[in-house]
Amino acid sequence: MSHRILMRVSPRTGFSDRLKQRIERNLIRACASDEGMASVAANAVPRAAPWLFRKFVLVLKAPRCDGDRVVERGVLLLKNTERLDFFRRCMSMASVLKDYTLVLEPSWSGYANPKLLAFDSYRDRPVVVMSPCRADYEFLERLNSRLRPISIGASDWVDPRVFRPLASPDKRFDAVVIARWNWVKRHHLLLRALRRIADPSYRVALVSLNVKGDQDRSAILSLIDRYDLARQVTVFEDLVPARVNEILNQAKVNVLLSRQEGSNRSLFEGFFAGVPGLAFANHIGIPLDHFTTQTGRLIAQDELPDALLYFREHWAKFDPRPWAMANIAPEVTTARLNLFLRQLARESAEPWTQDIVAKCNRPGLYYYPDAPDEPDRPDNKPDGHGFATVDDLVSRYATISARSSKANSSRTRRSSRSGAVPD
């Protein structure tokens, strides 16, 4: 926790760097010690309910067997920090890792987190960790553990068939903000910027998702009224992805106001929709190198009003979709991950005769391209592959204690719904 706070509050000061180095040295020693990792990995066992993992667990490659013996491991993707932690505690991980290489897609930056570090306790198998934030990538590299970082994340799995430019959209909004009703999204910065701009013709779309556990909706709406901005801010809630794409197409710039979060997806959905992005240059979590002269701008916080006015007039100078299709489309990201996994297999002298299939985030895990007549089935089988479903995985790998754990089941259901970041 100390390391995560230091990274967020003061990532570049010498004093914080010295503290971080001391904390990291202790973490490195813990990761090198079986006893240290056992203490991190020890948690109460929740009930292994399949609903807990649907759209958060996906097989990208099936194991290849010779009779009852696995001769080539498959690839299993776990998404969302809370859900992958539940998975680890519910399943017989020795059996899972005997059959699959794990790929983790955490939902929040700051990887000095027991829920991630616990996966280093399985000494005989490497675990791949998507690390879009440079600080997290470098942190895992310095640990020199079995957690192997790759510089991809949620931003790199957007479905370009859903998020795409529409024919001649009317630019109704000067800006769009896609954000949960949560203080971490810092809506107040936008509202203060609008008050500073003091132009009643400036229009903003606020697209929000109501997530159980988020408690700041009424406070944010009250702040809109307090600043007398109700006529300038149009609120949309709980839209399906295709409708979010329509709102994106009606906006001139897509704004991220947070200081830290996970890889973020909405900014890059905007890229695929042809809408430039605007974020803060000191943001922790998003891949900052995705911002180019084609895709958008990174700014200082006090530059927000001027930047909003700039995009109001110059949005047409940006064209982010070609860059996104060439660099972060699902096929491109799948190829990068596949190469990384193949090299990892060779390092371990393991066979690699079958590549992984592609997936996308919409926002849960889906195969890509999926069945055109059933695009919303999370367990559809691309190209006829008979991959294991979530129910199959729970049936095969759930521990006896997880199958029988009923005392914790209601508590697990409540915490997973309120605490998980739906990204």
Name every feature range the model reports, one short phrase each.
Residues 1-100, 335, 411, 417-423:
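N-terminal pre-catalytic "stem/leader" segment of glycosyltransferase-like enzymes
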Residues 163-185, 191-196, 204-205:
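Conserved donor-binding/catalytic core segment of Leloir-type glycosyltransferases
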Residues 217-239:
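Nucleotide-activated donor-binding/catalytic signature segment of Leloir-type glycosyltransferases, i.e.
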Residues 246-251:
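Short alpha-helical donor nucleotide-sugar binding micro-motif in glycosyltransferases
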Residues 259:
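Aromatic "clamp/platform" in nucleotide-sugar-dependent glycosyltransferases that forms part
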Residues 270, 276-282:
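Short hydrophobic beta-strand element within catalytic cores of glycosyltransferases
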Residues 312-370:
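A charged, aromatic-enriched C-terminal amphipathic alpha-helix characteristic of glycosyltransferases
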